[in-house]
């Protein structure tokens, strides 16, 4: 998503690896390069909920999980969820940034919590977990699933 802690090295990465695509949800693309978030430093390719991005032999499914920003996504790769700033080990992302929404993060958490099966959860910050562990112990995820 668009905040600098996730996009700050994109220009250097693209310089080192020309032709590597940079994906960004359109809801966050609208926020970059202005007063909210600095420019990403590379051309971006939009992706939407339900899209599947191919990376070698891997299929990466895009789940739109707005919360921290309106274009937040979770990437599902096999039995792994890359949850960005939506779901953390024992917590959730902040919603006090431009475009953040408590109601949206709760809906996004509910969506993740209701996925069938178990997944390894790799957030954008803090430690790794599993979805089953978070279903049992994460107050915010439990509230979202009940709501």
Show the residue positions of the predicted features.
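Histidine-centered active-site/metal-ligand motif
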Residues: 1-6, 25, 64, 68, ...
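Active-site HxH/HxHxD metal-binding segment of metal-dependent hydrolases
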Residues: 2-56, 139-143
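Metallo-beta-lactamase
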Residues: 31-39, 59-64, 69-147
């Amino acid at each position: 998503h668009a905040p600098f802690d996730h996009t700050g090295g994109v220009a250097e990465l693209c310089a080192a690896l020309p032709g590597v695509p940079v994906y960004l949800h359109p809801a966050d693309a609208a926020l970059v390069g202005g007063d909210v978030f600095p420019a990403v430093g590379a051309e971006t390719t939009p992706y939407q909920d339900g899209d599947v991005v191919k990376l070698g032999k891997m299929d990466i499914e895009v789940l739109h999980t707005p919360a921290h920003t309106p274009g937040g996504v979770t990437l599902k790769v096999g039995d792994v969820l890359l949850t960005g700033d939506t779901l953390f080990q024992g917590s959730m992302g902040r919603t006090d940034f431009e475009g953040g929404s408590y109601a949206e993060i709760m809906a996004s958490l509910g969506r993740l919590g209701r996925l069938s099966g178990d997944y390894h959860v790799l957030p954008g910050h803090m430690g790794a977990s599993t979805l089953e562990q978070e279903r049992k112990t994460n107050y915010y995820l439990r509230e979202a699933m009940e709501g």
